[in-house]
Amino acid sequence: HLREPGFSYKETIRTGTLAAAHGGFAHVAAMPNLNPVPDCKASLEEELRRIRESACVHVHPYGAISVGQKGEQLADLDAMVPEVIAFSDDGKGVQSESLMREAMEQCRRLGKILAAHCEDNRLLRGGYIHDGAYAKTHSHRGICSESEWGQIARDVRLAEETGCAYHVCHVSTKESVSIIREAKRRGVNVTCETGPHYLTFTEDDLQEDGRFKMNPPLRSREDRDALIEGLLDGTIDMIVTDHAPHSREEKARGLEKSAMGVVGLETSFAACYTSFVKPGVLPLGKLMDLMHDAPMRRFGCGTELAIGQPADLTVFNLSESYVVEPEQFLSMGRATPFAGVTLTGVCKMTMIDGKIVWKEETL
């Protein structure tokens, strides 16, 4: 979420792409919860103009599924096809089954992926953290797991019926993993992702602090373990940052009132390397596939290294550790559950199209 245009007090294209370079990412996909929403050619062109002016890494914009992301009327998908990586209303679930079916039919016709934030508003009931032990013992309103997996089950059925290429954003529950695993066995064209925070933290780690609040929320140990199992057996195709910056004020209101979302561009690789490669859970090559190759394959972006061609390269020191200090981030967002955690794997340099766009001062 690069937040520009419309929410530049949270993040800008410049600061967000600098954060990406600092974290070792050469390509990022920009979600459409902007103002104006990229739901037609004109609003998308405004976003593209700003990307051309300010981005220091490759930015691939999403087009919105619905007009204004209101979930009522299909956006002008045809007009946006040449410039968008996929279509999504990320940040909101598409509540209407008929609209989702129409969107999938159009995406199949256009040869584009539909990526969904799955959340059934009827089941939210004002919740803002996982509906588990912590919510009950600390008198918080919980978000039930079914609000996610119920909509995934609906969408998988629609994808099977329409033949749409369907992608599930930020999976967080064990039921979601099971539904997607079974869909893949049936041959449904579905992929999914999760984020480092869902693979690392659970509701047991919650504190009364906005840096632990995101959507979907941190779930139970069982859910976290199911996500890891999904990585190992191939059900979960990729790990993404779900970088969602907010202002300092918006994240300083505790669990109940803080905005939902945490930053991730500058910690994601190191967090996953520390949790999975160092202890031998995953080989480095598998992590690279989850964070780089698989997204490139699915979404059709990026280029391969070739002699004589401008290169996108990232240099990491995999033996160097550091303590996460959010005040050192290049992102305007500071809220992360990894604050104060020691991680291994430091990005030393990022090169885009043969030009160094970020490097450590001591390099």
Task: Give the role of each language-model region.
Residues 137-165, 232-233, 237-239, 244-318:
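His/Asp/Glu-enriched, well-ordered alpha-helical/loop segment
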Residues 74-239:
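Histidine/acidic residue-rich metal-binding segments in metalloenzymes
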Residues 1-11, 32-34, 60-73, 91, ...:
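Active-site mouth loops of central-metabolism enzymes
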Residues 49-65:
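A glycine-rich helix N-cap at a beta->alpha junction
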Residues 254-257, 307-362:
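C-terminal cap of metal-dependent C-N hydrolases
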Residues 20, 24, 59, 87, ...:
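Divalent metal-coordination and catalytic microenvironments
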Residues 25-27, 57, 85, 237:
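Short acidic/polar active-site loop segments enriched in Thr and Asp
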Residues 1-54:
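Metal-associated gating/positioning segment near the N- to mid-region
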